[in-house]
UniProtKB/Swiss-Prot annotation:
Function noted in UniProt: Acts as an assembly platform for Rho protein signaling complexes. Limits guanine nucleotide exchange activity of MCF2L toward RHOA, which results in an inhibition of both its transcriptional activation ability and its transforming activity. Does not inhibit activity of MCF2L toward CDC42, or activity of MCF2 toward either RHOA or CDC42. May be involved in cell cycle regulation.
UniProt subunit comment: Interacts with MCF2L. May interact with MCF2, ARHGEF1, BCR, VAV1 and FGD1, but not with TIAM1. Interacts with GTP-bound CDC42 and SRC.
Keywords: Cell cycle, Coiled coil, Membrane, Phosphoprotein, Signal-anchor, Transmembrane, Transmembrane helix
Membrane-protein topology: Single-pass type II membrane protein
Basic and acidic residues compositional bias, start-end: 457-467, 553-563, 591-605
Residue spans of biased composition, Basic residues class: 176-185, 468-478
Lumenal side: 240-753
Annotated protein name in UniProt: Cell cycle progression protein 1
The gene coding this protein: Ccpg1
Database matches in InterPro entries: CCPG1/PBIP1
Bilayer-spanning residue ranges: 219-239
Amino acid sequence: MSESSSDSDSSCGWTVINHEGSDIEIVNSATASDNCGLTLECSLVEQEELPVLYVGHGGEESSANNTSSVGETMLSSMRETKSAAEVEEAPSPEDNVYFGTTSDDSDIVTLEPPKLEEMGNQEVTIQEAPSSDDLNMGSSSSSQYAFCQPEPVFSSQPSDEESSSDDTSHEPSPAPRRRRNRKKTVSISESEEPPLAEPEDEPSKEPSKRHFSRGLNKCVILALVIAVSMGFGHFYGTIQIQKQLVRKTHEDELDGVKGYLSQRKQEQESFLDFKSLKENLERCWTVTESEKITFETQKKNLAAENQYLRISLEKEEQALSSLQEELRQLREQIRLLEDKGTSTQLVRENQVLKQYLEVEKQKTDSFLREREMLLEEARMLKRDLEREQLTAMALRAELEQFIPGQAQSRAESPSVQTEEKEVGLLQQRLAELEQKLIFEQQRSDLWERLYVEAKDQHGKQETDGRKRGSRGSHRAKSKSKETFLGTVKETFDAMKNSTKEFVRHHKEKIKQAKEAVKENLKKFSDSVKSTFRHFKDTTKNIFDEKGSKRFRAPKEAATEKTRTAYSYSSYSQQEAPNQNQNCRRPSAQRDGGREKPSHSEEIRKNANSYTYKAKSDCRGTHSTRRVCSGMFECAGQEAISPVNKASPVRMNDFKQLIHWYLLNELETFHHWKELDQFISPFFPNGVFRHDQQLFADFVDDVKGYLKSIKEYRVEDGNLEKLDGCIYRHFGHVFALPFGPRSVYIKPCYYNSF
């Protein structure tokens, strides 16, 4: 393209931007004189031209070929203005940049923009100067141009010969920037030479140029229309290419995101695997640590056990060595005796000693049997004594109960003084009975203490006799035969004498205590019976004289129940030897009769049987057949003191107590169903029925049923304590007013009452 075309481009204010490659060319506009010398044809072209034009590769080549002839005519009109501008200014090669000129250092071509005062009146025109086929607008076939308005900036004075290599200028200039290839930069100096040589022929060709300029304008317009259409087509193709590029970039980005996600997933899986591996390692570490600790503890235990075994082995070795030494000595003694020879005297002495030993064994066996019998008899005496104590307490409680009723009737009764005397006598009698009971208790405690002391002394004597006998035998081996026999005889004589004395003393004490207890029990039972009958008759007379309906029913019930208790005690006198043969046989053989112990036992059972809390409990529990009219009647049914209070006996509690006792005493019991079938009829609705049978009789029946089972007929009497355990659990534990019992009495007998 020529200089004129470059001037027209710069004057029209177009900026050309090439989108291909990385090289940029900046084209500055020409001087103000070039802008003023535009022709009329250029102004016509400006009116019809678009503000922005995108020109493709094919459009560029066609427009350049069509407008090459038009550029030649335009040069003539441009020379005069250009020459005047060249005269006014002396341009330097650094001030102006020729269109299409490049340098080896840069691909930027800069054209100086117009001045600010001329920018307002300036219009946009495009002219294409003639150029050779090899120039092709100084761009590659794939170049794309964008034309836009230049930015108004201050610039220095431009020159036509300014080099395109002026990259270092710091002045801003609104010049069209075009990207082009380096290889296709062509110098303009050759194309500028012909127009510089033609100014001499312009005056002669001026009329023809005008006519030609009109046709040229039409051609230019046609070329511009073609170029615009081609530019729009190229722009549409560019948009499609851009869309494809955007789609492709999106696909690439999507592929990259997918790859990144897959990579992150793999990393996460590897991290999870690492985490699980770490947990497994920690678990294995803890297991190994625990195993290590257990191994260390086992090692310590084994070391301690080894040490203990070593010590015990040393002790056993020492004992074995001592036994071996003793065995060696015995063998030596046997050898010495064999050397001396056995004589008939030694054989006789041995026979005599054997006879003594047999006699003493028989005596000790008889003593042991007699001791067991005495112990059993002592237990029976203790039980009888305790029964009498309970009977006295029951009588005292009944007396205290009837005292308020007597006090109320004293005001109405004429025999107040006689009753007071009788009450005083009864109180004195009770005091005497209490004193007798205390005396008997002290005597029984003393007897038991003496018996235990004698037993301990006898045991010590037996152990001493054995030690002396063993020592005497050892001495006899070392000493002469006479010394050995003498020591053995002395030992046996001492044991015999001590045993005889102990047995004699013990028998005397037992006889004395037994006789005293019998007498006291007889006197006590007689006095209690007489006192109770007298008291009963007195109270009966009092209530008969009073004639009160309120006191008549309890009085009759009390007399009836007391008579029933005594009649039942007479019946139990016949049944007691059969039911209690195991525990009372020794004393029965000695005494011959069991009337008083059986009577006292029945009183104890009735006194320790289950009682009731209050009148409401009695009425609520016994609502069938025989209903309790009051607390006195309920107490009379069980033959106990009316001051005792308790809850109804429930079947679950009774079964639990029986199960607990049998498991503790017998350890194994396999007849639970039979026992439940035996117990259940006495507990309708889960509560014991007193109108069917007394609770004491029921306990005796259960005890007899358990004894009747063949598997549990044990000689040690495990079932003898069953009734005491039941009474202790369900009955009232009386606080005995006679002080603490002896320390030698078993807790079961003490706590059961």
